Every structure is written in structure tokens, then in C-alpha cells.
Amino acid sequence: MCKYLHMERDSRKIIKRLLSEGWEQVSARGSHHKFRRDEVSLIVPHPKRDLPIGTARSIARAAGWL
């Protein structure tokens, strides 16, 4: 079974988790929200219910969830 099947893909829930873990939203331009913590930054497309699995995986890796 693929370990990515149960990965969160809803941008609203991803953003909520990032903010609860201390990430700071530094900008939002159009549908892309940029977050930063320490020296790491990442971009989350929002609003989007079903992010592509590759995008969700990339966000999870940058956030340290994988």
C-alpha cells in the first residue's frame, strides 16, 4: 500500500497545520500563499481541495512531515 494515500491534500487543512506549527505567512499573490519558518520557505496553492499528490508531497517534505 502506498504511504501517500492518506496524505492531506486540502489546502485549507495544510495551511491550518502550518500555522499551528509556527510557520508565518509572508505573502499571498493570487492563489499562492508563501510561508516561512527559519530559513525554509514554501508555497501553497489556495484555495484548492484536491492538491496533486506530487504538490502535497513536496509541501510535506519542505514542512518536515515526511
Residue ranges and their predicted role:
Residues D38-L66:
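C-terminal structural segments of small proteins and small subunits
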Residues M1-M7:
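Short, intrinsically disordered or compositionally biased N-terminal tails of bacterial proteins
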Residues D10-G22:
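Amphipathic alpha-helical segments
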Residues E21, Q25-V40:
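Major-groove DNA-recognition helix of helix-turn-helix-type DNA-binding domains
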